Amino acid sequence: MRTLRFLISARHLCARGRGIPAGQALGTGNNAQKQVTCCLHTSPPPGPPQATSSAGSVTPYEDVFQREQRNKASFVEVLDLYCNRDVRRRGHVEIIEAALRWMTEFGVEKDLEVYNKLLDVFPKEVFVPQNYIQRMFNHYPRQQECAIRVLEQMENYGITPNKQTCFLLLQIFGARSHPIRKYQRMMYWFPRFKHTNPFPVPAELPADPVELSRMCLHRIANDLDSRVAVYQMPYTEKCDDGKEREHLHVVGIQSPSQVSLLAAHNPSTPVYVEGPFPLWLRKTCVYYYILRADPDPMRKEEEIDNERSLYYPLSLDLELDRDLGDDDSFDVDDVEEGPVFAMCMAGSGDELLLGKWIRGLQETNPILGQTPVVFRLNSGPQELSVPQEKEAEPKGELEDDEGEREPERRRMEQ
């Protein structure tokens, strides 16, 4: 009788949950037991899946990311909108992955506060393992992988986590989780590699092109005695016809050893202006030009006495314990290159603008007035896109410019 009462009560509960009429819930013996077993193990009725509401999907948040003004305030506003919508935070993985894709568009990819805000989207104390078996396996793997992707993006942009990041990860996943291990590795290596570069690039680059060129040339030049000279400052000139003509900057650098090397150059051998060569400073790419010559085949290296050479010292320290297979020296193919006499940075790769650099070098290097100068210029990115105003100029003005450049070019080749 006790078993029968339990089966009848279970039948009533199933009838309430599935909407079965109460009259069908009455039964005795084996019939009641069969009905309860059938009700407990029956799959849901076949049919098309019910459409979820648009509020529970992540697609509206993609639309919000596209619709809002792309700044930090609107990005945080979208995250607050999601957090205040539902306490259970359904779809939190999708919204975090969508936010990671849009961070560069909003300009917050290097903001630590925004990354902590993304981690705050996870529900708290839900994914913490409760026993050693859950800790042994990857507990809630999708959520842990999503948090690791957030930390990896922080690592790619060089952002060091803080104590709030650790507190959020402990509150969300616990102390033995994979995101915590990732956080510990980042905190171990980031402080060690933060100051390894002896020539660090400043976080904020100067906006002035002359100061930026001065800083870049100092980074390229290996001689501390190098002198930077500004041959032309950027300015705007008004022509007689009322049009404004913009003059770009020209900044060069040369060391005393390069001056002496150029003074010993044979005037009958031409020198070359080559470029542009790219130089990356974080996300900014600048271009520089060099003045060089071909290697002199008649030049003989001065033989150094063994007593005065550092490569042939008087005392030899032979490692007799090493075998021939222990040679860890590198096999380097020495490529003989020509001497580099000077470097410069200019607003454009125009021969007329670089000619002002050569004329400025003639003041400290008189031999350039007797040496032919040949321009070997590649099509840089600034020359690929021709403005529409220059394309619309009449042919007469272009011929006048060519006429002005021709005597300049002949004088340099003499």
UniProtKB/Swiss-Prot annotation:
FT transit peptide: 1-27
SMART domains reported for this sequence: ECSIT_Cterm
Compositional bias ranges of the Basic and acidic residues kind: 388-397
Pfam family, one: ECSIT_N
Protein's cellular compartments: Cytoplasm; Nucleus; Mitochondrion
Residue span of region Disordered: 379-414
Annotated coiled-coil segments of the chain: none
Keywords tagged on the record: Cytoplasm, Immunity, Innate immunity, Mitochondrion, Nucleus, Transit peptide
GO cellular component terms, A-Z: cytoplasm; mitochondrion; nucleus
GO BP terms in the entry: innate immune response; regulation of oxidoreductase activity; regulation of protein complex stability
Principal location: cytoplasm
PANTHER family (alphabetical): ECSIT EVOLUTIONARILY CONSERVED SIGNALING INTERMEDIATE IN TOLL PATHWAYS, EVOLUTIONARILY CONSERVED SIGNALING INTERMEDIATE IN TOLL PATHWAY, MITOCHONDRIAL
Function: Adapter protein of the Toll-like and IL-1 receptor signaling pathway that is involved in the activation of NF-kappa-B.
Annotated family: Belongs to the ECSIT family.
Protein name: Evolutionarily conserved signaling intermediate in Toll pathway, mitochondrial
Source organism: Xenopus tropicalis
